[in-house]
């Protein structure tokens, strides 16, 4: 039995990189997984983990769209039941100087890295409050506390993610 046996974890941005690593680690520790990603390729990771004996559901959603998030979470909960752990991992990083960054690039970062976290947390939190149980993990970076010259969009969005988390324990 693993440390997370009997717990269901929703991991956003689970297809690759850190999100995939979190999914594999949680699976090794016995968690039931809900893997959320914008890419339908997330099904392949879910199939692989299911093939290794882990309980796993893949859902495709765009974290920028609250309706997409709500529909995906509804589908996942119909299959997996409650969500015990939320890992807000989905994020993007387009490198470039501040002066070269377009308004579209700025909005892209904000929509995924700030609003996306907001949308997923808002969809999951009410049930956790009602149960008086649940855990939310916010992925961030040291760039929340410093400015990276090659990535001016990262610092504000990482800082926003880190700072927003502070008030959540007081809710409910």
Language-model features: locations:
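Substrate-binding pocket helix/loop in short-chain dehydrogenase/reductase
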Residues: 97-98, 105-110
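Conserved glycine-rich Rossmann-like NAD(P)H-binding loop of the short-chain dehydrogenase/reductase
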Residues: 29-44
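The beta1-alpha1 cofactor-binding region of Rossmann-like NAD(H)/NADP(H)-dependent oxidoreductases
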Residues: 60-72, 103
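Residue(s) in the substrate-gating loop at a strand-loop-helix junction
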Residues: 141
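A short, exposed helix-loop element centered on a Lys and neighboring polar residues
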Residues: 121-122, 167
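Conserved glycine-rich cofactor-binding loop
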Residues: 8, 15-16
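Active-site loop-to-helix junction immediately N-terminal to the catalytic Tyr of the SDR YXXXK motif
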Residues: 101, 147-156, 168
């Amino acid at each position: 039995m693993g440390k997370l046996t009997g717990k269901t974890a929703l991991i956003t941005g689970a297809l690759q990189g850190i999100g995939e690593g979190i999914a594999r680690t949680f699976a090794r520790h016995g968690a039931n997984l809900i893997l959320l990603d914008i890419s339908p390729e997330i099904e392949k990771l879910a199939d692989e983990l299911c093939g290794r004996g882990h309980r796993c559901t893949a859902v495709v959603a765009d974290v920028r769209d609250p309706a997409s998030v709500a529909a995906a979470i509804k589908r996942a909960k119909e299959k997996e039941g409650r969500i015990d752990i939320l890992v807000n991992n989905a994020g993007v990083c387009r490198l470039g100087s501040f002066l070269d960054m377009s308004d579209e690039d700025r909005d892209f970062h904000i929509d995924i890295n700030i609003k996306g976290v907001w949308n997923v947390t808002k969809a999951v939190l009410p049930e956790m409050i009602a149960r008086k149980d649940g855990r939310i993990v916010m992925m961030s970076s040291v760039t929340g506390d410093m400015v990276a010259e090659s990535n001016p969009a990262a610092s504000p969005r990482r800082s926003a993610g880190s700072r927003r988390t502070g008030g959540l324990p007081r809710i409910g």
